[in-house]
Amino acid sequence: MASKVLPQALLVIPSNHSLQCPPLKKQLGFPIDSNRRFSLSSNCRSNLMVSRASSNLFSSNFSSIFSFPARNSFVVRSEAEDSSDAPAESVAVVAEEELPVESEAEAEERPPRQQRVKLGDIMGILNKKAVHAAEELRPVPGIRTGDIVQIRLEVPENKRRLSVYKGIVISRQNAGIHTTIRIRRIIAGVGVEIVFPLYSPNIKEIKVVSHRKVRKARLYYLRDKLPRLSTFK
């Protein structure tokens, strides 16, 4: 390490051949004769020559150590860049050509996404199917509030005999297959209300006797009115 640092320190000394060592009279404090001065000057020149030679050797060693890998790295980089130019372009072109084909194939292979069916939708579908099946067995006329209807009902407890009920429809509650109607009539001066499921299999026939126009959807106010308003022919 010291051998490498010493030439760097010696490089600071100027390289002029005519330069002589500075007088040592002031430094040493006593006079020096010419022979000794000449010997000192020769010694200084020899030191200068040694320092110059050592600096040249050091510079040559330094350049040989540090410049050779730099040249090799530069050559390697240039070769890598030259060799990778053409394949990079070809790879890019191939990738651009293959991307649309893959996207089209994926679009064709993917099946259409099915929408999620909620529980309420399922119940609605089942109600529609049940209503459609019940209407095929027995057609149901359009019944509105205020109509006078006649219903033929089969009673299982009465040896399946048919009973006829007639009255005014005071309300209708729509609930799919569970739709019901409420009928009111006067029996022995007393108002009687009966609820019938509209799609019940025990109902064999529903007949609309007459239609009446009313303003309200539910005629519950007839309960407080006179019985003659709830009678019909």
Curated annotation (Swiss-Prot):
Q: Which GO terms describe its biological process?
A: translation
In the database record, which residues form the transit peptide? 1-77
| One protein family per Pfam | Ribosomal_L19
For this record, the Gene Ontology CC terms, alphabetical, are: chloroplast; ribonucleoprotein complex; ribosome
Could you tell me one molecular function GO term of this UniProt entry? rRNA binding
Q: Fetch the SUPFAM superfamilies from UniProt.
A: Translation proteins SH3-like domain
User: Is rRNA-binding included in the keywords of this UniProt record?
Assistant: yes
Compartment(s) of residence: Plastid, Chloroplast
Subunit structure as annotated in this protein's UniProt entry: Component of the chloroplast large ribosomal subunit (LSU). Mature 70S chloroplast ribosomes of higher plants consist of a small (30S) and a large (50S) subunit. The 30S small subunit contains 1 molecule of ribosomal RNA (16S rRNA) and 24 different proteins. The 50S large subunit contains 3 rRNA molecules (23S, 5S and 4.5S rRNA) and 33 different proteins.
Tell me, in a sentence or two, what this protein's role is: Component of the chloroplast ribosome (chloro-ribosome), a dedicated translation machinery responsible for the synthesis of chloroplast genome-encoded proteins, including proteins of the transcription and translation machinery and components of the photosynthetic apparatus.
> To which protein family does this belong?
Belongs to the bacterial ribosomal protein bL19 family.
For this entry, the protein name equals Large ribosomal subunit protein bL19c
Tell me the lineage of the source organism. Eukaryota, Viridiplantae, Streptophyta, Embryophyta, Tracheophyta
